[in-house]
């Protein structure tokens, strides 16, 4: 057994059916740092003999899917492109400046027919997010996804064929901020009819940012100076997905819940710490819950909170996700349960993944490349209708 402990770096590769074009990417997840976004940097390898004088282009697309693309309603597809960019890679029209180490090593390994490309995201695009479909809607999609495509054509006016193109799904993601905001705390008072003094509710969290899979504790204090009895206290994590396309729709779903049936009598004080754990595992049957975008055959989690660059309009098209803790008191009325009322307060918080250790890769030059092919069946569900027809013809 070899004693070589050299680390390995995965390179994602996909080749067109006609073998003329191959795309190499060093990663599939591109990080939105709020102030800037990682560019999509890769390498295209071409076979000039198979291209027969054709040019090679690379495109970057952000699309909003909101239905089953197999169905075409009066000529309308269930897809809207939010962003599209294109560049000619071969023959190169301009040199790519400041190549990454991965690009440099790939070009050295692949030889003279390797050409680098860099494409940038604008700062207003949403991250990769989808809405969980109902169990009966397996083939339907609603969400934002990103795609890198390379294709060969004599010119841009010509319609290229599926066999001359390569499509790779990527993700745009965000990580938890380095400097979280102040600790969330909220309080409210409620004056009841025929009570001289109010009911006071205070709720607080230990911090603003929680990671996926982390338990959230909510400290609740009820100071009941009124003549009413608090019959129940409940806490919940509510996810709000703002879906902005042709209109602005809000989907609010409860993704975690805890309650106490202990009564708070008049002229008394009650303190309790509630525990909440928002996980997709507990919500797989709930429709329209927002999830982080996923690549085929991979699991995902509840969608991360959306962080926007200062000055960016929140009506940007896509799906924006927010979380809050809602604390609700159920208070008895004059006629008992028939006239119960509720007192509530809310605590906004952030739910995200932690930022990976930036020092994990110090010597990229010492790494071996491991090439991982993008499986063609991974993208089969994502093909547009006309492309599916072409693929079926190619397979005959």
Swiss-Prot record:
Pfam families for the chain: Arrestin_C, Arrestin_N
GO molecular function annotations of the record: G protein-coupled receptor binding
The keyword GTP-binding is assigned to this record: no
One of the protein's GO biological processes: G protein-coupled receptor internalization
GO cellular component assignments: photoreceptor inner segment; photoreceptor outer segment
Keywords: Calcium, Sensory transduction, Vision
SUPFAM superfamilies: E set domains
PROSITE patterns found in the cross-reference section: ARRESTINS
Top-level lineage group: Eukaryota
Keyword check for Cell inner membrane: no
Annotated function: Arrestin is one of the major proteins of the ros (retinal rod outer segments); it binds to photoactivated-phosphorylated rhodopsin, thereby apparently preventing the transducin-mediated activation of phosphodiesterase.
Family label: Belongs to the arrestin family.
Record's miscellaneous remark: Arrestin binds calcium.
The name this protein goes by in its record: S-arrestin
Organism of origin: Aquarana catesbeiana
């Amino acid at each position: 057994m070899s004693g070589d402990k050299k680390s390995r770096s995965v390179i994602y590769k996909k080749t067109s059916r006609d073998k003329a074009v191959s795309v190499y990417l060093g990663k599939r997840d591109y990080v939105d740092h709020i102030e800037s976004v990682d560019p999509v940097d890769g390498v295209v390898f071409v076979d000039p003999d198979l291209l027969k004088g054709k040019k090679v282009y690379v495109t970057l697309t952000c699309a909003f899917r909101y239905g089953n693309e197999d169905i075409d309603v009066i000529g309308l597809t269930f897809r809207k492109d939010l962003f599209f960019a294109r560049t000619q890679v071969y023959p190169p029209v301009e040199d790519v400046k400041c190549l990454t180490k991965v690009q440099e090593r790939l070009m050295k390994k692949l030889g003279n027919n390797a050409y680098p490309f860099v494409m940038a995201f604008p700062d207003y695009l949403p991250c990769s997010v989808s809405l969980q479909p109902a169990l009966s809607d397996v083939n339907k999609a609603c969400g934002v996804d990103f795609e890198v495509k390379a294709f060969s054509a004599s010119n841009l006016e010509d319609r290229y064929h599926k066999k001359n193109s390569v499509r790779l799904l990527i993700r745009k993601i965000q990580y938890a901020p380095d400097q979280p905001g102040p600790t969330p705390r909220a309080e409210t008072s409620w004056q009841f009819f025929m009570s001289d003094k109010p009911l006071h509710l205070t709720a607080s969290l230990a911090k603003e940012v929680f990671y996926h899979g982390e338990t959230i504790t909510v400290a609740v204090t009820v100071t009941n100076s009124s003549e009413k009895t608090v019959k129940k206290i409940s806490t919940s994590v509510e996810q709000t997905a703002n879906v902005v396309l042709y209109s602005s729709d809000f989907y609010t779903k409860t993704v975690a819940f805890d309650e106490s049936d202990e009564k708070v009598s008049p002229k008394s004080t009650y303190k309790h710490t509630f525990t909440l754990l928002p996980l997709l595992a507990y919500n797989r049957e709930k429709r329209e819950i927002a999830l982080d975008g996923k690549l085929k055959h991979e699991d995902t989690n509840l969608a991360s909170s959306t962080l926007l660059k200062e000055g960016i309009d929140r009506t940007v098209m896509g799906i924006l996700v927010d979380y809050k803790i809602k604390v609700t008191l159920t208070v008895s009325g004059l006629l008992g349960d028939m006239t119960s009322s509720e007192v509530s307060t809310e605590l906004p918080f952030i739910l995200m993944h932690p930022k990976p250790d930036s020092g994990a890769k110090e010597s990229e030059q010492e790494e071996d490349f491991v090439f991982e092919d993008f499986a063609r069946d991974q993208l089969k569900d994502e093909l547009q209708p006309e492309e599916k027809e072409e693929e079926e013809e190619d397979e005959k």
